């Protein structure tokens, strides 16, 4: 299973992960590329750093997207750590993650923007 920028916008991400583990054969692979797209609602450092998720949406009313994101669980948890814990709990045997994009605050804190999770059932 391969997903890219999907998991963050699911109302029930744990259920989605459970379905993924259900349909995968033994030794099946999950590749999930995602990010902390709306974590700025939860974390002041992310908020101060700003977010450029909407730069490519010129002329579009993004308030609708923002209102939806405010209701999503994954807007309020730091990832990929959260995902890794869920994947362990539901039965994935091997889990690796890689940070694909990050930035540093003036204080030196690393902010994870995009990541890859590779999990094997």
Protein language model regions, located:
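Short catalytic micro-motifs in class I SAM-dependent methyltransferases
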Residues: 5-6
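Nucleotide-sugar-dependent glycosyltransferases with a strong bias toward membrane-associated enzymes
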Residues: 10-13, 17, 80
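A conserved beta-strand element that flanks and buttresses the S-adenosyl-L-methionine
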Residues: 2
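A short glycine-rich, Lys/Arg-flanked "PGG" loop and its adjoining helix->strand segment in the class I
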Residues: 14-29
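Short conserved AdoMet
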Residues: 11, 25, 121
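C-terminal alpha-helical "lid/dimerization" subdomain adjacent to the S-adenosyl-L-methionine
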Residues: 33-107
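A short, glycine/Asx- and small/polar-enriched loop/turn
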Residues: 109-114
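C-terminal lobe and adjacent flexible extensions of AdoMet/dcAdoMet transferase-like proteins
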Residues: 90, 115-121
């Amino acid at each position: 299973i391969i997903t890219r920028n999907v998991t963050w916008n699911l109302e029930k991400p744990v259920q989605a992960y459970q379905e993924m583990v259900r349909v995968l054969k033994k030794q099946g692979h999950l590749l999930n590329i995602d990010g902390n797209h709306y974590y700025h609602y939860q974390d002041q450092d992310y908020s101060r750093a700003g977010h450029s998720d909407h730069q490519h949406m010129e002329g579009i009313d993004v308030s609708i997207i923002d209102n939806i994101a405010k209701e999503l669980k994954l807007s309020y948890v730091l990832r990929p750590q959260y995902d890794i814990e869920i994947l362990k709990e539901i039965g994935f045997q091997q889990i690796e993650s890689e940070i694909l994009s990050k930035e540093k605050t003036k204080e030196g804190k690393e902010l994870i923007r995009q990541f890859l999770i590779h999990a094997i059932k």
